[in-house]
Amino acid sequence: MRTHLRALTAVTTVTAVAALAACSAETTDDAAEPSQDSAAATIEGPVISYNSPTEWANWGAVLEAFTAETGIEAPSDPKNSGQSIAALEAEAAAPVADTAYYGVVFGYQASDKGLVQAYEPEGVDEVPDALKDPDGEWFAVHQGAIAFLVNTDELGDLPVPTTWEDLTDPMYEGMVGYLDPTQAAVGYSVLTAANLALGGDLDDFGPGLEWAAKMKANGVVNPVQTATASVQQGEIPILIDADFNGHTLTAAGDPIEVVYPEDGSLAIPYVMSLVADAPHEEAGKAFLDYVLSDEAQALFAESYLKPIRDVEVDPQIAEVFPDDYDSLVATPDFAQMQQVQEDVMARYQAEILG
């Protein structure tokens, strides 16, 4: 991974560009070709993007910067991935949203249900093939990865675990947690990551289920909902979760060490789509172009989500990702991961939860 050394100044930059463009417009001959900002101003808005809560993934700053650059209003939306899919289905006859954002598995669902349409924004050629739909109906905008979030204060003199097998050691009895895979998408990603790291594949979840059985015997905690506060407060000293949640806690001064397991992790991509029959389709396209821009990618990185494109970010943010990130973090066939999920969860229910 290349590390670029430029401060994150996207909001200031785009605002300045917009201001300069406005000043230039006052002195430009009427016959001159309109600027990109002027062209954007002719696009009818607003753009409604489902699942863009202000405090998540730095969406608040991204939406604000997009409006500053284009003049197109872009209100935030509080839905999560599942709620977004449900709303798109309910509104299919008269769509309300123009774009939608969700975990990659939901991208497959949206495509399969005919809820989205093809659009390939500027910069999509830099998105890895495994992280975009071949027909252009969704593409990744950034990703997280599975990691061990370790509260080092609560760990005391115990060594920090670095592999999946380490977590099954009796010295960590009752100290490890991960979200219930039958209830949470991140939990299923944890199980899949462990399975792949321990020699399994998407056709064989045996190693992952054996690991889960050992974890159960070692007193693992399986919350149903987000448990970041539990590791922050020391209730769960070692939480297996999304890396960006840990980096955020560390940046806030909490005693959290983020460990990418030496034997392998798993990518957690987040993708976007243009909604089928979007009421403000051109505004939606402009927004999708923007989320892959250097400015937006750098803004997403402020929440410790790894940009999907190789862009310049604050060096203090870039340095939290290990140099061997790309080799540690597996990118499986997410379509197959979705297809086998029901059967794997049935086995987990029977063999682990019993």
What are these regions (language model features)?
Residues 18-22:
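C-terminal motif of bacterial Sec signal peptides marking the signal peptidase cleavage site
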Residues 23-43:
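Short, low-complexity, disordered segments immediately C-terminal to signal peptides
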Residues 38-44, 48, 52-73:
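Short, polar/charged alpha-helical segment
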Residues 48-60, 79-83, 95-235:
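Extracytoplasmic ligand-binding site segments that recognize negatively charged/polar headgroups
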Residues 105-111, 232, 237-255:
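A ligand-binding cleft/hinge motif common to bilobed small-molecule-binding domains
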Residues 144, 174-183, 209-214, 220, 252-276, 290-313, ...:
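Periplasmic-binding protein-like
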Residues 147-154, 192-197, 268-281, 291, ...:
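A bilobed periplasmic-binding-protein/Venus flytrap-type ligand-binding module shared by bacterial periplasmic
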